Amino acid sequence: MFSLRKTKLQPVSLHQCRLSSLFRGVLIHAIEVTGTQSQASLQHGLAGKAVLSNAKYLSVLTRFRTSTRFDVWSIHRREAISSISGSILLQARDPAKLNEEIQIAVDEHRCDEAWRLFEQHMQMEGFPRKSVVNNVVVCFAESLDSNWLQKGYSLVEQAYEEGKQNLLEKEPLLYLSLALAKSGMAVPASTILRKLVETEEYPHVSAWSAVLAHMSLAGSGSYLSAELVLEIGYLFHNNRVDPRKKSNAPLLAMKPNTQVLNVALAGCLLFGTTRKAEQLLDMIPKIGVKADANLLVIMAHIYERNGRREELRKLQRHIDEACNLNESQFWQFYNCLLMCHLKFGDLESASKMVLEMLRRGKVARNSLGAAILEFDTADDGRLYTKRVSGKGSEVKEHDNPETRVVSIHSMIPYDEFSRDRKFLKLEAEAKDVLGALLAKLHVQVELITSERGVLQPTEEIYVKLAKAFLESGKMKELAKFLLKAEHEDSPVSSDNSMLINVINACISLGMLDQAHDLLDEMRMAGVRTGSSVYSSLLKAYCNTNQTREVTSLLRDAQKAGIQLDSSCYEALIQSQVIQNDTHGALNVFKEMKEAKILRGGNQKFEKLLKGCEGNAEAGLMSKLLREIREVQSLDAGVHDWNNVIHFFSKKGLMQDAEKALKRMRSLGHSPNAQTFHSMVTGYAAIGSKYTEVTELWGEMKSIAAATSSMKFDQELLDAVLYTFVRGGFFSRANEVVEMMEKKNMFVDKYKYRMLFLKYHKTAYKGKAPKVQSESQLKKREAGLVFKKWLGLS
């Protein structure tokens, strides 16, 4: 027997397509295949009660057909009935029973069956019961399968589109958002969070911090994470939410905390969106979040990347006073400070920092306290190397990183998720992801290391300082610094010192005058060197036919008591012969015989050079050659002017910023992406300056076409696009979108869709005016193109 429900019918006016799809759903999805009864038996009524029940059901449909209001049914009746052939019986599915079947499929984790039944219910009566809808969402989320996650998200999307978001509960939506984030689907994950905030179903900060943490592991996800924190943080600017009202408790539970900011900022750092990260830093005092040790170090990285040296100096006081920073965090801060000194060409401050580190290291090595410390830590060294938290807590033996990674990339059961009302497990998960992000930041520290708890410079800082001194032509200062460094550091042989390596690098790169100047500084400082460096420089002079310099170098070698090898004399003889100076060549040969110098002399430099050019290990000489060959870094003056323009733009003093930009150009400094980003965000903050941004856009394109100093990045183009959309300059907005898509940059369509609906909701609706100018026509076309790109047409 079939269980048939009485259906209340009311005569309404329906569109033909709507009506036909409705009744076809009732018929075709209410089919039961018996497989035992023939067509003949069906025609002669031998199917029994089932056929009678179906006949009764069809009689109801026949009455629909005879009604004048449902005249359209006759068009599709023949199609529906004729499609039923063979051993097929009609059955009207009971929605209540269908709900039960969906629930059973969900309980048994049969996602395909649950989805098939869900689609049947959607075509019959729309969405199932609220509990069933949420259970389907949870089932798809638990699978962590991209196909089912997409179907789950499409289900949620359809519910919001049809205004039935009341069917969706907050916890299943959060669970789905977490699953999407873990599967690398950052856009739908962030959209669900945004929808929850819009509908005032505020997610707890511990829950959405875990979603953000997984989103931040990818480039587009990290950018979206920063946008989400800015959007949610805006709700709490300047204490606008009263904590005394009980009704504000759910909203206050969503307020961004230190961990959320650390996650978003670390993601921005790893994927290079540091100007977006600086916007997050500007928000911190407005929402009253306290900085911890991790946040202080992350701030240092951001200030270094953006060239904010003064901010770094202010931060240094907090770093030095903080009592909960571990060794790694000190490395990272002073590495950032050292890098910033190099960016600004402040070689004096950088060299002073290096010498101070060496001096402290020498004291530590020679002190009795260091010896005691080394003895005490000999048995406890394993724990010392595992210090990971700010207060020096150790990682326990059972904290296996592999098990932690598994927990990060698998879903906790929904039962546990729903019971954890404070979302402590998700908070711990976000903390684990943050630890992984911070570990990647630590790997980027290359200028500083540590010995017995004392910061020490690496070879990389010597290489970078040597390059900076050479580029600025400060040979005397370079020699003075390197000699002091060798005095403070552990002694090395004169032929293997840093200064000799720099001289050899200069020779191999053809910087012979600089090499000669450094040799002179060594000689005047009383530092004795071997013959190999003189031999190398002499041969280089001979190869370039610099006779005067050869004579000068020979005189210097004699003063220093250096005996040249046979290869030098051979090079001198060959040079004289090339210049047709036979008499000079004979004199050199006689001098060589009188000195009793054997052939096959020192070939040390040639071997060293071949080793660097081949696949030898990246030693000090190789690093020097690679660093010096690289293109010169950004002019320090650009950093200075960028800071000035950023200051004025941040304060809203755009006239002063314009004057600074004009002065910057007049001094020969070419503006870069950071310069224009400060200007555009400054104009956007004060509003109604869209013409000025349009002029800047034209200048950016012309500079980018003419020079390589101007490179469009995601942050700059996103700021320009936001301003154009806000002002309704859709022709320019389409240009920016085209450029971003051509460069495969992520565009946050959701943000621009909301922005468009906020300021231009009624624009470009209905038919175009009959009378309009060409410019109006183009503006309308551009607006419609942008609207179509947003998916609003």
From Swiss-Prot:
TM region(s), chain numbering: none
Subcellular locations according to the entry: Mitochondrion
Transit peptide as recorded in UniProt: 1-87
A single cellular component GO annotation: mitochondrion
Pfam families found in the cross-reference section: PPR (PF01535), PPR_2 (PF13041), PPR_3 (PF13812), TPR_At1g68980 (PF25245)
Protein family according to the UniProt entry: Belongs to the PPR family. P subfamily.
UniProt name for this protein: Pentatricopeptide repeat-containing protein At1g03100, mitochondrial
